[in-house]
A protein has these predicted regions:
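Outer-membrane beta-barrel initiation region
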Residues: 8-88, 140-142, 165-191, 296-306, ...
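Transmembrane beta-strand segments of outer-membrane beta-barrel domains in Gram-negative
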Residues: 13-14, 96-249
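Transmembrane beta-barrel strands of outer-membrane/channel proteins
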Residues: 32-34, 44-46, 58-64, 86-108, ...
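Residue-level signature of outer-membrane beta-barrel architecture
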Residues: 34, 48-50, 76-78, 130-134, ...
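Gram-negative outer-membrane beta-barrel proteins
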Residues: 36-40, 52-54, 66-68, 80-84, ...
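Outer-membrane beta-barrel translocator/channel fold
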Residues: 63-131, 158-160, 233-298, 397-407
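Outer-membrane beta-barrel "beta-signal"
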Residues: 177, 378-380, 398-413
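C-terminal outer-membrane beta-barrel translocator/porin domains of Gram-negative envelope proteins
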Residues: 180, 187-343
Length: 413
């Protein structure tokens, strides 16, 4: 006999707590920042979970100093209780820097990058989600747009290499569909069960020179309960780009986009291996590969390959897998109420993890060259729905410290 959809979901692990909690929590703290090639200043971080005892979560980072601007988000704004909700993200930064490595793929060195600096970066993300069966099934539609201006190129130490005059503008738009099957005992803090999240995005071209491609990503996580109230998580992730329309693939055009003038771009297109031209040609080849093959979900940052900076490894295909032991050594319910922080403690958690990943331009080359991360940390699982993370991760290029407000392996945007 065929089971109905509600019956099939009811056979999964029983939810161990309310899935639409309204327990409030907040965190506010200032912190200095120093961004190579940009400058320094002060940022103020603010988070409010289940704002005013609703399901709404709000997050805001304000920057003062050389990188003035703000990053903010709101999540779980239900317009139909326990059924339909909105989420949104806003980025508005007056000065930014992006690391651009000498080559896509896995073979660039740690300091083999330039910093692309711009005076403006804006990004808006809007998502509407349908939630069913106590959040065991969620489907979402997503829209994202971004705009930026690049005006100079620095080396990895912050020294000026080239001025881009007039500034080079870039813009992009993405429309996506998300589907998540959550066959676990809790949506925000799972300890047993299985979770599958799939995304399907169309990155549209804003002009004739830009590529247009589909991006499919799938993340599968299995949670094995251990030590009573703890869990051992195993995660697999795959992301693939498929180009529908190529962008420009001409070397001279790509060199002009790197900031070279007409004369130098022409010279380097005829002598790409010369010592003076090679760095620019390598960067131009990155652009050509991106325009020809598209770009899958990158590796690096707080979500996957945590010992590497964000977007460290990029190509048309991505493979990632990892495991993480989450030991909840204190699960007593305690109210924490300080001036800068308030929440209900649900678990104090120690974690150790290992991760490995690979990217490549051709799918058959995935796994030929890999990079790994391993580390550990402490977490506080709050009743407001947030998981406050402090971790140290290390790998082939050194160590990274992570301070974050959600579990890893969740982001596919």
């Amino acid at each position: 006999m065929m089971l109905s959809v509600p019956t099939a979901f009811s056979l999964g692990p029983e939810r161990r707590q309310e899935q639409f909690s309204t327990i409030p929590g907040y965190l506010v703290f200032p912190a200095p920042y120093v961004f190579p090639g940009i400058g320094e200043g002060l940022m103020l971080v603010g988070y409010s979970g289940n704002f005013l005892e609703t399901t709404i979560d709000a997050y805001l980072v304000g920057f003062s100093g050389d990188a003035a601007g703000l990053v903010g988000s709101v999540d779980e704004v239900f317009v139909v209780p326990e059924l339909i909700y909105f989420s949104g993200w806003k980025f508005n930064i007056s000065k930014y820097g992006i690391n651009s490595y000498s080559s896509r793929g896995m073979e660039s060195e740690k300091d083999d990058f330039n910093i692309i600096v711009g005076n403006k970066f804006e990004m808006d993300i809007f998502k509407v989600s349908l939630s069913l069966f106590e959040r065991r099934l969620e489907a979402a539609l997503l829209s994202q747009s971004q705009y930026g201006e690049s005006h100079k190129i620095l080396d990895s130490k912050g020294n000026l290499l080239n001025e881009i005059d007039p500034p080079q503008t870039f813009q992009g738009k993405k429309e996506g569909i998300e589907l998540q099957l959550d066959w676990t005992d809790d949506f925000k803090d799972p300890r047993t069960g299985l979770r599958l999240k799939s995304t399907y995005d169309l990155n549209t071209s804003e002009d004739a020179d830009s590529p247009e491609y589909y991006l499919t990503s799938h993340g599968l996580t299995f949670y094995q309960p251990v030590f009573g109230e703890s869990t051992w998580a195993f995660h697999f992730f795959r992301s693939d780009a498929k180009v529908r329309k190529e962008g420009y693939t001409d070397l001279k055009t790509a060199l002009l986009a790197e900031g070279l003038n007409e004369e130098n771009a022409t010279s380097c297109s005829y002598a790409p291996t010369s010592q003076a031209c090679a760095p620019y040609v390598n960067k131009a080849q990155n652009t050509i590969n991106a325009n020809r093959n598209g770009t899958a979900h990158p590796l690096g940052g707080q979500d996957r390959l945590r010992s590497y900076p964000g977007n460290r490894y990029q190509a048309a295909h991505t493979l990632f897998y990892g495991t993480e032991l989450r030991w909840n050594f204190d699960t007593s319910t305690e109210v924490l109420d300080w001036y800068f922080f308030s929440d209900v403690l649900q678990a104090l958690q120690a974690t150790v993890f290992w991760e490995q990943g690979s990217v490549s331009e051709e799918a058959q080359d995935l796994g030929k060259i890999t990079r790994s991360s391993y580390g550990g940390g402490l977490r506080l699982v709050g009743g407001s729905g947030n998981t406050y993370r402090f971790e140290i991760s290390t790998g082939e290029e050194g160590a990274e410290m992570i301070v974050m407000f959600q579990y890893p392996w969740r982001g596919e945007m």
